[in-house]
Structure formats: structure tokens, C-alpha cells
Design a protein with these regions (language model features):
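N-terminal secretory signal peptides that target proteins for export/translocation
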Residues: 1-9
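Acidic Gly/Asp/Thr-rich repetitive segments characteristic of extracellular carbohydrate-active
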Residues: 30-57, 61-65, 305
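Consensus "Asn ladder" position of solenoid repeat domains
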Residues: 108, 130, 135, 153, ...
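All-beta strand scaffolds that present successive hydrophobic residues in beta-strands
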Residues: 73-76, 103-107, 124-128, 147-151, ...
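Extracellular beta-strand-rich solenoid/capping regions of secreted or surface-exposed proteins
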Residues: 42, 61-74, 83-124, 142, ...
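Extracellular beta-strand/beta-solenoid scaffold signature
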Residues: 86-97, 112-119, 134-142, 157-175, ...
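Bacterial N-terminal signal peptides
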Residues: 12-23
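Sec/Tat signal peptide C-region and signal peptidase I cleavage site
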Residues: 24-28
């Protein structure tokens, strides 16, 4: 086949793809749900198609489950909608249980579940501009190979972990794509366990967030997991600012980011160390001003220490 034929074929393929995408957008629908009028999100989810938006208002006292076959939809709470788990027997103990893919969840207060937002699957979601508050277990939980982008969201007053990433999953916390400079910082505070927990062969970018007053460490990375932890403010947590253990690893800088080191504000020391490393972990990069009651660092002999001054 000559070059002209290849170019013509490529052009036709691109045109066809563009037409298909335009058709998808043209067919996208907006479904309005007023929970105060007796409508439910679950009823709307029964008929949505890829590209649709479910526009929600009111207080929705229901358990919301997004099925695995649901893809590329938006749930928009318009910053004025609450999803509140009703308690008692329900399809799931979690307020919002997502098994779908490429789901956008934005503008909600999510409360009253075992977990506030739970991804399992593998599932994928963009969680943007929400308040996840007063859930008895974890605020946001991501497992079984799921991927989440968590942006502009407050996670607070969970009974346990604030944001939990486990089971070969991945999370972008505070940044949409590592190479894009813009930050979308989250606030993770006043949770009953670590602010952020990364474990069991999982990974994360954790950039530009405020992580404070959690009962245990600000960030915990362990059990063969890895995280890039950059430009966060980590204050007044009950444990360390960052704990690394059990063959976990933390990079405190990256070629793709220029946001500066992590910080602990003056007078807001963490209860443990700035960084604690044990049982075969590693830490690489500038410590910044991370500190705690036990000083900036607490490493055992099994850890690889490649930390540096800012």
C-alpha cells in the first residue's frame, strides 16, 4: 500500500471517529432528579446511557449503587445535594457504591454510610468538589484494581481512614494528571485513622493537599505500595506526618512536578515523626519542613534513606 492510500485511510478513520463522538454528544441527555419531591437517583440510573448527566437536588435519603455496566455518566449534585445512607437493610452499607467506569461524581455531600464513596470492581471515577463527612468506616475507599481522581474534595470525620487505596488500585489525590501543573487540592481532616492510606500493591500521586488532625498518621504507605507525595501541608496528626513500612516507598519529589516540598506549619507538629520508615521501606527526596514530636525523621536500619534538606 502506498503512502497516499495510508493517509487517505487514516483520514477516513479519524473522520469516522469524530462523527461517532459527535453523535454520542448529540444523544447525551440530562435527567433531573429532585429528591425533595420524591424522585430518586437509583430510578434515574436505570435508564441512563453513556454521556448522560443526572442533575440532582435536595436531600436524597437512599443508598446509591452504580452497576458495572454503567459507563461515562455524570452525577452532578450542583453543590447543594446530600446523599444520606438511609440505614438499616440496603443494597450496600456504603452511601455511594460505584462499580461503573469513567463516572463523574461532583457537587455532593455524602454521609451516613459505612464508607461514603466506595469504588470496587475494577471501577473508575472522577470525584470532584464533594464533601464526604461522618461516615462510620472510611470516607473514600478504592479497591480491586480501581482508579480514582479525587479533586477539590473535603473528607472529614470518618470513623476510620479518610481516603483508603488498596488491592492494586491507583489514586490521583489533588492532581488530575501529574504533568499538568494545575492543582485541585483536597482537605482531609479529623478522621479516626490515617488521613490517607495506600496499601497492598497500590499507588498514588498525593499533591497539594491539606492533611490535618487525623487520629493516626497523615499519610501511610505500606505493603508493597508506592506514592509520590509532594507539596502537601501535613499538620497536627496523631501519628507521623508520613509513615512508610512493609516494603512501601515514598518519593518526595518528581521530575514532572515543581510544586516544592511538603510542610508542617509552625506550632502544628504531628504526634510522631515528620517521616517514619520501617520494615524495608524507602524514602527519597527533600523532607521540607515535615516534623513532629519525635523530630523530622525516625528510620530503622532496614529502610533506604535518600532524604535530603529542602
Amino acid at each position: 500500500m502506498n503512502k497516499t492510500a495510508i493517509l487517505v485511510g487514516t483520514g477516513k478513520a479519524a473522520l469516522l471517529a469524530g462523527l461517532c463522538f459527535s453523535a454520542l454528544l448529540a444523544n447525551a441527555a440530562t435527567v433531573s432528579v429532585d429528591c425533595d419531591a420524591g424522585n430518586t437517583i437509583m430510578a434515574a440510573l436505570g435508564s441512563v446511557k453513556p454521556g448522560d448527566t443526572v442533575l440532582v437536588s435536595g436531600t436524597c435519603k437512599e443508598q446509591v449503587t452504580i452497576a458495572p455496566e454503567v459507563v461515562r455518566i455524570t452525577l452532578d449534585g450542583q453543590k447543594k445535594t446530600t446523599i444520606q445512607h438511609p440505614g438499616g437493610p440496603a443494597a450496600s452499607p456504603h452511601a455511594l457504591y460505584n462499580r461503573g467506569k469513567e463516572i463523574i461524581i461532583k457537587g455532593f455531600t455524602v454521609t451516613g454510610g459505612l464508607d461514603g464513596i466506595h469504588l470496587s470492581g475494577p471501577a473508575s471515577a472522577l470525584i470532584d468538589g464533594n464533601v464526604v463527612v461522618k461516615n462510620t468506616g472510611r470516607g473514600i475507599h478504592i479497591d480491586k484494581g480501581s482508579v480514582a481522581r479525587i479533586l477539590n474534595t473535603t473528607v472529614e470525620q470518618s470513623g476510620g481512614i479518610g481516603i483508603d487505596v488498596t488491592g492494586a488500585s491507583y489514586a490521583y489525590i489533588g492532581v488530575f494528571i501529574p504533568r499538568v501543573p494545575a492543582l485541585a487540592p483536597n482537605t482531609i481532616r479529623n478522621n479516626g485513622g490515617p488521613g490517607i492510606n495506600i496499601e497492598r500493591t497500590s499507588g498514588a500521586w498525593i499533591v497539594g493537599n491539606t492533611i490535618s488532625n487525623n487520629k493516626e498518621s497523615g499519610i501511610a504507605v505500606h505493603r508493597n505500595s508506592q506514592a509520590d507525595v509532594i507539596a502537601n501541608v501535613i499538620n497536627a496528626n496523631g501519628g507521623d506526618a508520613i509513615t512508610v513500612s512493609h516494603n512501601g516507598g515514598v518519593n518526595l519529589s518528581s521530575e514532572t512536578r515543581r510544586d516544592g516540598p511538603n510542610q508542617t506549619a509552625a506550632g502544628q507538629n504531628n504526634g510522631g515523626a515528620g517521616i517514619k520508615c520501617m520494615i524495608g521501606g524507602y524514602v527519597d527526596g527533600p523532607i521540607g519542613t515535615l516534623t513532629g514530636a519525635k523530630g523530622a525523621k525516625d528510620f530503622d536500619k532496614s529502610c533506604v534513606d535518600r532524604t535530603a534538606a529542602p
